[in-house]
Amino acid sequence: MKVLLGAVNAKYIHSNLAVYCLKAYAEKYGDTSDEISIGEYTINQQLDEILRDIYKRKPDMLCLSCYIWNLTYVEEICREIKKVMPQIIIWIGGPEVSYDGVKVLERLPEVDGVMKGEGEQTFCDLLHFYQDKTADGLQNMKGIVYREQTGQIVENEWRKTMDLSKVPFVYENMELFEHKIIYYETSRGCPFSCSYCLSSIDKCLRFRDLELVKKELQFFIDHKVPQVKFVDRTFNCKHDHAMTVWHYIKEHDNGITNFHFEVAADLLNEEEMELIKTMRPGLIQLEIGVQSTNLDTIREIHRTMKFEQVAEVVRRINSYGNVHQHLDLIAGLPYEDYESFGKSFDDVYALEPEQLQLGFLKVLKGSYMEEKKDDYGLVYKGMPPYEVLYTKWLPYEDTLRLKGIEEMVETYYNSRQFCYTLPYLIRHFKRPFTLFEKLAEYYEENGLDTLSHARTARYEILYDFARFYDAERCEAYKQLLTLDFYLRENAKSRPLFAGDERISKEEFRLFYDREDEERCYLENYENMEKRQLRKMTHIERFSYDVLGDMKEEECVLLFDYQNRNPLDHQAKVFCVTEEIRELCKQ
């Protein structure tokens, strides 16, 4: 029997860990002669393209992995492929269908069954069943919802959780994952009970054997994988486990591979903090879910978090200067209105994370949040991703306002392109939330929200916005935007707002002549000629102390683009004001 495991990913750079686990597990433990293959697609592909690929592969059985971002697309595939391959057996699985399998099969007569929860052993049992119909029937198989020949839908009991160490390592052939993000898990389940999350349903927390984990981490390190994203729901919930992994990647660091972890900041203890402090800049990045700082909200969603403790940890890690921190907020939670969310936003913004994700509540099937929707006046979209429209605290008009703010945060904060301009702008607006609120209004009023803007155009727009609200400090904004621009862009054509205040050709020549004779700043360019030095660097004159307190005084900066900060990708900067002055005196 030919079996195709299909995955419809959100982006090409993503890979689907689940289908690779099912294939590897079945090939190791399944007593079958089935030919199992994997087909990975994206939601950006045309449906016809995916149907053609499935049809040409001629599978007898098609298994599709379902998530909140692809369910609608997967359902369409099921409906259409059954028309052109009426004999095909179709099973689906994944978190988006595990908790309402009966309704899914009622909605999709083309589908034969749903695999609930962990699918490795269930998939093996299904292969055995279809290969040998004399085996125990589907009625005795745990972890499935299926359709009998009569059309009746039957839901069997859940399967017990499995030993995670039995799942084979899926990345032996790295050619399959070239240019893709590597996902890796060392634990399943979650110790917390957050009402908006399906992970809270799985209370059986289990871990992969650490000796296996070390061996697999070494594989990633040896292959110089750019990034490994751990999918563990709360990686540091078990101290010894986290410390072992972190010690290993630190001691075996190849200077290239980055590891991404979701952590609970308030669980990080002194020993873990001290270890993090010693890591190479960029070795790890931490994703920390705050969601809200409203105490009533935190209590209602069953979240165990002390924000003061989280804030202390985030600030301390920030002071190390070696870890990218990504903090999350969720709009649409109970007891959180527009003003309350604004306060949560300001609280998190003050921690200065590298990324601040403003997300919107997704009402997942089977979650406690879905049960309480009527109590909360919670209305959400009927199609995946089931995103909140409004609640009794947050009217739809305010949801739309927050959508605009989300876009501005993504464009102007998370891009890390405006690290000097934004703090200066906030002084005028008093609080960060107001700045992004007004910026979103400015975009809408000027018809900018419906257009696609080049990266460099964002600087021009922000300059116009700053002039509109704070014309008196127009020159200061021009200087700061020029600084931000050259920190990120090795551009030889000047932006319009930068003006003509640049170093002279003679100053330029004198500086690079001196640097060519004796490396005072650009030591890493030892074997480069003067012409190459100029290409990889930039010198800019400012009339304000842009790196300091913004006093009106001359400041000349050298930008080194070969040496960038691994956390925000900004060029290394040297103040060369005195050197330029001395050279001109000679």
Residue ranges and their predicted role:
Residues 2-6, 47, 60, 407-586:
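Radical SAM enzyme core and accessory elements
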Residues 25, 35-160:
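Glycine-rich beta-alpha loop elements in corrinoid/cobalamin-binding modules
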Residues 6-8, 65, 93, 231:
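Short hydrophobic segments within beta-strands
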